Amino acid sequence: MELSPRAARNRGEYKRLSIYTIAASILAAACIVALIFTVWFTAVIIDDRGMEPTLERGDAVLCDKLALTFSSPKRGDMLCYRAVYGGGVYMGRVVGLAGEEVAINGGSVYINGCLLKEDYITEACPVDMESITVGEGMFLLLPDARSSMQSTASEELIISAERIIGRVAVRVAPISSVAVFE
């Protein structure tokens, strides 16, 4: 059955509109994804060995910038934070919270005099640290690879809340090691 000229014209216009609708939908979805990643996440490539074995050099992670808007960091959280000088981004694990007294003695971390159990640590810390009290709005962060610590200078370990970028949420690369962190 042959279509009338008007029906053939309508069919052609319908196909053209369908292509535009699909293209507009894809563009809108791409814009929404870009907006979410700009506002919600920061991508970071690990360039040192400080968080091994949890995160290795060359891993790509997404730091959730909004997670800390609704809750404070907890002990054990992995955080991305801005360096004091040079503008670099570093990673560390929350060990000490505001008001706590933290010491490192004989390779072990003590919080308010009690030994901190850390399942993610494979090597003891090679340096001792006198007991220090973490100030209000501050967090004491340590690397997982404690054997790489050369210093326990508090200005390097105690991070203000303003310097925190976000909580490490997902390892996205390499693909074989994709993981979600809680």
Show which residues each predicted segment covers.
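Extended hydrophobic leader/signal-anchor segments used for secretion and membrane insertion
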Residues: M1-E182
